[in-house]
A protein has these predicted regions:
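Hydrophobic, well-structured mid-protein blocks that either form specific transmembrane helices
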Residues: 1-11
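Glycine-rich hexapeptide-repeat left-handed beta-helix
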Residues: 7, 16-20, 24-77
Length: 77
């Protein structure tokens, strides 16, 4: 609900995107990933399959996520 999903981003099978999220251009959300509410995924960021990203997180541009992210975290290169 009320999400922004930019061009050339990819959201794969069984991924769940929370409310009020922003998925930037070129981000790749792999299968079975859960993205919490009010989370920002930066341009070119990539998630490994089957991880969880908490509420109110910021994942910076180009970050490769390989494990779960707790709520209210900022992940950058």
């Amino acid at each position: 609900k009320n999400c922004i999903i930019n061009n050339k981003s990819l959201i794969e099978h069984d991924a769940v995107i929370g409310n009020h999220c922003h998925i930037a251009t070129g981000a790749i959300i792999n299968g079975e990933v859960s993205v919490g509410n009010e989370t920002f995924i930066g341009s070119g960021a990539i998630t490994k399959q089957c991880i969880s990203i908490g509420n109110n997180c910021i994942v910076g541009a180009g970050v490769i996520l390989k494990s779960d992210v707790r709520p209210n975290q900022v992940i950058k290169n």
